[in-house]
C-alpha cells in the first residue's frame, strides 16, 4: 500500500509540475503557485506520504542507519530535480558559492532538526512526540513577532495555552503508564530533552529559512536545491562518525534475503522526499512560518492516533485527551488566523488613503 501511494504521488507530482510549466506560458499558473490553501493541502498530503514511507523503511526492516537514509533521500532528491530541470519541467538558479555560504547555517539546522527528531522518537511514543511538537509553534509565533513584525492575538494566545496544556496532559499520561521504574523514567526524560532540543532547532530552521528566502528571493526549487545539496555532505559525515558501519550491523540493515527490496524502498523514499521538500518551501513562502508549523502539527494528529492503535503506545484517558486538546488548540489557532487576516484586509484600504 505504501509503495502504491508513493508511486501515485510521484506520478501526480510530475504531472502537476509539467502542467504548471505549460500553464506558465499563458500566465495561468501564478494564481495556483501563490495560493495559500493549495500549498497547505499539498504540504499535508506530501508530509503524510513522507511519514508513511519512512515508517515503512525503518519499521519493516528495523533500519537504524538514519543519517545514511536521509543522505540517500537528499541525493535522490537532487538527481530528481536535476532530471526535471533537464527535461525543461522546472527551473532553479545555478550554484553560487556566496549564496551557499549564506545558506549553509540553514542546512546545518535542517540536519540538527532531523537528528533531534529521530532521537526524540527513539525514546518517546508517537502521540507524545506529536503533542510536544506543537510547542514549536509557540516559539515560531513569537519569533515572527521579533523578526517579521507579526502579532499574537488573544485567541491565538488561548490556542497556545491549550497546546501547553495538551503537552502537560501527554506527559502525565506517559508517566502514569511508565510508573516508578527508574530505568524507564530515565529514558523518558532523555526523550523529553531531545524533544525540547528539536523544538528549538525546528523553530530556528523555519524562521531563519523564511528570513533568508526574503533576502535572497529564492523560489521554491531554489530552496529545495540548496537545502539538499548542502545537507548531503553533512549527513554523510555524521553517518560515518555516529552510526554503526560494522559488517554485523550492515547485514542487519541489508539482510541478503531482502537486500534489493531495502535498497529500492530507500530510493523510493528519496523520491517521495521531493514532494515534502518542495511543498515545505512553497507553504512557508506563500503563507507564514507559523501557519506552516501549525498545519504540520494538525497534520500529525492522525499519525498520533495511529500510534495509539498500531504502535503499542500508552492508551489511557490522559493520552487520548492530550491528542484531542491538541486538536482543539489547532482549531482555535486556525480561527484566530482567519480573523486576523480579515482584520488586516479591512485595514489595508484605510492605510492606502
UniProtKB/Swiss-Prot annotation:
Side Lumenal, residues: 53-66, 123-125, 173-187, 249-262, 314-316
Membrane-crossing residue ranges in chain numbering: 32-52, 67-87, 103-122, 126-148, 155-172, 188-208, 228-248, 263-283, 291-313, 317-336
Statement: the UniProt record of this protein carries the keyword Transmembrane: yes
Protein's cellular compartments: Golgi apparatus membrane; Cytoplasmic vesicle membrane; Endoplasmic reticulum membrane
GO cellular component: cytoplasmic vesicle membrane; endoplasmic reticulum membrane; Golgi membrane
Keywords recorded for this protein, A-Z: Cytoplasmic vesicle, Endoplasmic reticulum, Glycoprotein, Golgi apparatus, Membrane, Sugar transport, Transmembrane, Transmembrane helix, Transport
Topology class, membrane: Multi-pass membrane protein
Glycosylated sites: 260
Function: Involved in the import of GDP-mannose from the cytoplasm into the Golgi lumen.
Subunit structure comment from the entry: Homooligomer.
Record NCBIfam families: nst
Recorded family membership: Belongs to the TPT transporter family. SLC35D subfamily.
Protein name: GDP-mannose transporter
